Amino acid sequence: MKIKYLSGVISAVTVLTALQSPCAIAQTGTGATGSDSGLEEVLVTAQRRSESLSRTPVAVAVLGTESLARQAVISEADLQLAVPGLTVKAGQSSNQLNYALRGQTVDSFSSSRASVLPYFNEVQVGGSASTAFYDLSSIQVLKGPQGTLFGRNSTGGAVLMTTAKPGEELGGYVSGWLGDYENRKVEGAIDVPIVPEKVLMRVSGYYQKADGFQENIRTGDRGGDIDRKNLRVSLTLNPTDSISNEFVLDYADVGGTSMVSVAYNTVPLGSSFVPTQLLYSPGLDTAFATPGLWDLFLAAHPGTDPEGFEASVAKQRERGPFKINSDAPNIRENENYVMSNITSFELSDTLKIRNIIGYTDLDSQIASEFDGTEYPADSGGDIGRIGNLKQFSEELQLVGESAGGALSYVAGLYYSDEEDNTYSLSQIVDLSPIAPVTKQINNGRTSNETKAVYAQGTLDIGDMTGVDGLSVTAGARYSEEDVEFKHKADDVYIANPAPPGAVFENPLSDTFEQVSWTLGLQQQLSDDLLLYAVTRRSYRSGGFNYFAPPLAGFGNEGGAEYQEEKATDFEVGAKWEGTAGDVPARLNIALYTMTIEDIQRSNYVSIFGQLAGITVNVPESEIKGVEIDGVINPTQWLSLGASVAYTDAQFTDSAVSVLQNPEVDFGPYPDQPDWSGSVFADLSFPITDGLEGSLRADVYSQTSSYFSSTADTLNPGSKIDGYTITNLRLAVESEDGGWTVAAYLKNAFDETYYVGGIGFASLFAVNTVIPGAPRTYMVEARYKF
């Protein structure tokens, strides 16, 4: 396997090097400037400074303002279709989302931090609620461990969202669209130069209201309703030529409902902690040795299928995921404030100080069906999960160049203080009026204080080595995280403590210290071709389980704590941008291998009679992969592109035991298809003088994947099929008039597919899944002024 992998690396580099021959490419000369390929230059900030994508020695995908609009990327789900290799996973509902990249993910009900972290204007933001992408200048997806440059360490990658900055002239845009499912959206922004060049303001807003895709045949309500309001104020101050300040405050108020999980498959009776197939069926009479109990239950729960649990799951499969029979309330409320403040002070032409302040205040409530059926086996009741996450961060950077520009560097100090208060209600096995419902309350506060110091630099060693264009990159970061978790008085593990002999410690606390590093070598062979190799070490912080009694020690040993997850990778890549003959083109290739130790994964278990999803450490895994993307413009009016990602992720040491529960082997790897890819064609054509038309088609496809880490053992049947999605856009634009009218058709062939699920088979004998969006259409009118 390693020989095949190495041969692939050599072959890829050979192909790109061959493109440098005079017959294959029109050279534009050598030097430090970008290639004159005819393609629009793409700028990225993956190394905390602005540079061309083609000269950045890391794997990164970028969507600019125009790409976001043409592909109608307005949410996380759209982002997955635009960036193969990135998975946007839904857990309990369609509005509880997490990114997965290069095999790194976070399980539902896990207490661990996400492995792929989102950033808003360089400020790391928490939470897992779905968001709206509007008035952005770019979205960048950084792939692989991020341990030396960004606010927090991560083992999978980062998603960087950058908002549009205020302009120097009065202007802006307004956009509105209408679609099926009563989908209405209004969006706009205006630039106001309060003091020309000195004080610039931009105000943008977003409003969307739509009916959900799911129909609840029991209540007539819909799952997935959207009622979203966003407002953003950006203020840029330039008091002098060397000092600038960029302030952004973003507010979101989101209501509606969620698309809920639906039953996917069941396991045989006796395979789960709760025998739902027996309790919710005519067999209830036998279970309690009392005739008439099932009829009594049905009378108290009108609308429930009298044939029982197994028959209900089969009927749900026949109905499809958009007609549900749910007995649980469906609530979704979010109110979020996110602030970023970036001050830059240029000490000289080669030295700059940057100060980045961030603040987030995220309130949320979400309640929905858990078990995916019409029976009250497990739900959040009328409360569900209520959370408040507050975070303050401060980062001081020194950015500069020295040695005549041969050395570029970034050094900094980072501090953050975070508090997460979460109250969760689970209603389990409601057999009323025969037996009372079990209400499990989990209520706790997690505090995290992080301090870090880091530095990274790139040195041109061409003169020293005699190899033109050769440079080396090295970076390191020391992080210290103080984590504390406290169960509150009404938490199930405090109100109903464990049997004698189990010593509680409340609060629990620990300090996690780690050194992350980056070491890379890159060569700019010409203006058009960059080759690089890099190895990185990063980690995901340890912590304490929310759904576990406060027992000292790690979960694998019977305690409530889980250890840091550590990732070490090696990546080689090539980036080429030039002209093949007279045709502008761009090609990026990355090949990587990564070893993960103490992988943080969820295990659904029973602890002292309470059901819990707790984070454990799986000893080791290995991930290998290849990522390729390219664009070619055969003519000025046609652009073609394709990308593909292959991921081979395996647990290599997978056995884990938790408290009194049996040992479990983890595998296969969840949330990661082996193959994913996309192709697009973008055609522009004149209509009349001043009017231009465009037609774009995007096709995304992926192979099957698993939504449970224990599909081979505890949760069989938690595999979802691969799928192919086609999106179309037809637009007419008047550049002089400043207006555009566009029609979109998403999921054109109405493919039924699933974007995540929960492996509940070991607890409730059923696995559940969340569907992706069905076919939708919309028409947008946009005007720039």
Q: Residue ranges of each PLM-predicted region?
A:
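Periplasmic N-terminal accessory/gating domains of Gram-negative outer-membrane beta-barrel systems
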Residues: T28-T30, V58-D107, V116-F133, S138-G147
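Membrane-embedded beta-barrel scaffold of Gram-negative outer-membrane proteins
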Residues: I342-E346, K352-G358, L362-S368, L530-R536, ...
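N-terminal Sec signal peptide and the immediately downstream disordered periplasmic leader
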Residues: M1-Q71, A77-A82, S734, K784
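Gram-negative outer-membrane beta-barrel transporters
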Residues: G29-T33, Y409-Y414, D463, V472, ...
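C-terminal beta-signal and adjacent terminal beta-strands/loops
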Residues: S37, Y539, W637, Y700-T710, ...
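Periplasmic-side early beta-strands and strand-to-turn transitions of outer-membrane beta-barrels
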Residues: L160, E168-E169, W177, P193-T286, ...
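Outer-membrane beta-barrel translocator/receptor signature
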Residues: L97, A114, Y134-S137, K143, ...
